[in-house]
Amino acid sequence: MAAAMIWWPRFLLLLCLTCKGSTFYVPGVAPINFHQNDPVEIKAVKLTSSRTQLPYEYYSLPFCQPIKITYKAENLGEVLRGDRIVNTPFQVLMNSEKKCEVLCNQSNKPITLTVEQSRLVAERITEEYYVHLIADNLPVATRLELYSSNRDSDDKKKEKDVQFEHGYRLGFTDVNKIYLHNHLSFILYYHREDMEEDQEHTYRVVRFEVIPQSIRLEDLKTGEKSSCTLPEGANSLPQEIDPTKENQLYFTYSVHWEESDIKWASRWDTYLTMSDVQIHWFSIINSVVVVFFLSGILSMIIIRTLRKDIANYNKEDDIEDTMEESGWKLVHGDVFRPPQYPMILSSLLGSGIQLFCMILIVIFVAMLGMLSPSSRGALMTTACFLFMFMGVFGGFSAGRLYRTLKGHRWKKGAFCTATLYPGVVFGICFVLNCFIWGKHSSGAVPFPTMVALLCMWFGISLPLVYLGYYFGFRKQPYDNPVRTNQIPRQIPEQRWYMNRFVGILMAGILPFGAMFIELFFIFSAIWENQFYYLFGFLFLVFIILVVSCSQISIVMVYFQLCAEDYRWWWRNFLVSGGSAFYVLVYAIFYFVNKLDIVEFIPSLLYFGYTTLMVLSFWLLTGTIGFYAAYMFVRKIYAAVKID
C-alpha cells in the first residue's frame, strides 16, 4: 500500500508533464516552399452554423466560380465531417499585394442575384453561417480584439485580448436588415526560410487571416482588368440583401502579406490555443484532486473492512458468529450463478471492450502528436478503422465470458457481438442521414461511402469478431473460486437505497465529476465548430475515469453482496454506466443554455447523435466497471475458506 501511495504522485506528475505539451503535434504533411510570385491556392471547405448543425458545400450559394470546378479527393473522416474541399477563383501570389480585385467581373458589370438566390443567401445569413477557406492547408481565421480592464493598474487601462474565430461570418443582420460580406481582405503571414547566398529565398505560409467587409455596390469603383477601388474610411454603407427581389453586387477581395517569426512547425498554435487554458488547467487539477481524494477514501474503507471480514471469517472457532454478522459471505454459493440473457450481456461487454481499446489507442496516439490537425479527417478515419480491427479483442473477451456463463451457442453469440451495438449505431445514423439528405446538406454521407462502411463492417469487423470469439470460446473459462449451489438462495427484501435506479444515480456522480469540464470543451468542439487538440488533458481525464468507474463499481457490488443480493451481473453493468445518465442531462442543459437551435431537423440531429454518444459512453463505463467488479468478487471469495 505504501509503495502504491509513492507511485501514484509520480504517475500523475508524468501525466501532467505530458499535458503540458498537449498542443504538440507531428506535422502530417511536408512543408511547401514558395518562391516569389508563386501561386498560393485558396480552397473552400464548407459552410457551417452552430444554429442548424447542417454543413453545406461552398458553391451551394451563388459565389463566384472558377472556369473549372475541381473537388479534392477526400478520406473517410473528411466525408463524415461534411467537408467538400473545392478550388476557388481567388488569385493569390506569394508575397504579392493586391489592393482590390473584382471576382467574376464581366465588362465591369455587377452580379445579379435572382430572387431565389437572394432568399437563400439571406436565409444562410440569418442562420449565422460561417465560410471556411484554406490556404496551403491552413484554415482561415477572423481576428477578434476583445478589451478588458486591467484592475492592477491605477488608471485601469483596457488590455487588448486577441482571439481568433474559425472561418468568417457570411454576413450580419441589423435592425431587421440583412447584409452580406462581399469583400474579403486576406492577410497572409509568411516565414522566410534561411538559404545559401547563391539560392533564391523561399517562403512558407504560417498564418491565414481574413477581414470580411460589406461594401455597397454604389461605393465600389471598378477599373480595367478587374481592378477596383475601395471607399475611404467610414464613408461606405454595407451591401444589403433584400430576399424579396433581385440584388446587384460585386464580390471583391484584397491580399496583404506580412513577414512572421512563426516557424512552419508552429503555425497551428494559433488555432489550437483558442480556449482559456488557465481555466482548463484549474478545472482539470481540481477534478483530479477531488476524484482521487474521494476514491482514496472509498478504497481505504473497502480494503480495511474487507481485511477485517476475511480475517474473522477464516477463524475456525468464530465461523457461526461471522456468518451472522456479514452478508457477503452468505451468498458464496450463488454469487457466480449465471445471469439471465448471458449472450446479450457478453455481447454488450465485447462491444465495450472494442470501444475501450479504440478510444485508448486514439487518445494516446493523438496525445503523442501523431494525428496532426493538418491531416484533415485523420482522427475520425483512424477511429473508424481501429474500431473495426479491435473486433478481434471484443470477440475474444465476449466469447470467453459467454463460456464462463455456461453458454453453448457460440456462433449465435459471435453474430450478436458483431451486430448488436454496430447495428444500433448504423440504424440511427441511417435515419438521421435521410433527414440530412432531405436538406441537401454536405453532411449527408454519400451512398458509395455508406456502401464502403457496410463493406468494412461485414468484411473486416464481423470476421475479426468471429475469429476472436472462436478462440475466446475455446479458451479455458474464468476460474471461479467457489462452487455454485444447485438451489438458488432466497434474496431478502432490499432497502430503498439498493434500488437499481438509485444505484445508477449514486454511482454516476463521481465519474461524471471527473470529466464534466472536459465534456464542455468536447461539446464546444463538436457543436460549435471549434478545434479540440488538448489530448494530453483528455488522456489524463480518461485515466481518472477508468479509476473512478472501477472503484465506484467495486463499492456498489460490495454493498449489494452485503445486502445478500447475488444478482450483480446485469445490475453492476447498468450501475457502472450511471455516469452516462448525467452526460444525457448535461447534453440537454447544453442544448437549452448554450445552443440557439429552434428548428426540428437540427434538434433531431443533436439528440440523435447525443443518443449515440450516451449509449457508447454507457457501454464504455459499464464495461470498465463490470470487469473491475468481476475481478474484485473473484478476489474476495478466493481469500476466504469455504468448506
Swiss-Prot record:
Signal keyword on record: yes
Keyword hit for Signal: yes
GO terms for cellular component: early endosome; Golgi apparatus; membrane
Signal sequence annotation: 1-23
One of the GO biological process terms: positive regulation of protein localization to cell surface
Pfam annotation, one family: EMP70
Modified residues (Phosphotyrosine): Y313
UniProtKB keywords: Endosome, Golgi apparatus, Membrane, Phosphoprotein, Signal, Transmembrane, Transmembrane helix
InterPro entries noted in UniProt: EMP70
Topological domain spans for side Extracellular: 24-282, 369-377, 439-450, 524-536, 593-599
Listed transmembrane segments: 283-303, 348-368, 378-398, 418-438, 451-471, 503-523, 537-557, 572-592, 600-620
Membrane topology: Multi-pass membrane protein
Cytoplasmic side: 304-347, 399-417, 472-502, 558-571, 621-643
Localization in the cell: Membrane; Golgi apparatus; Early endosome
Predominant cellular place of this UniProt entry's protein: membrane
Function (record text): Associates with proteins harboring glycine-rich transmembrane domains and ensures their efficient localization to the cell surface.
PANTHER family hit by this protein: TRANSMEMBRANE 9 SUPERFAMILY MEMBER 4, TRANSMEMBRANE 9 SUPERFAMILY PROTEIN
Family, similarity comment: Belongs to the nonaspanin (TM9SF) (TC 9.A.2) family.
Protein name: Transmembrane 9 superfamily member 4
Protein species of origin: Mus musculus
Gene: Tm9sf4
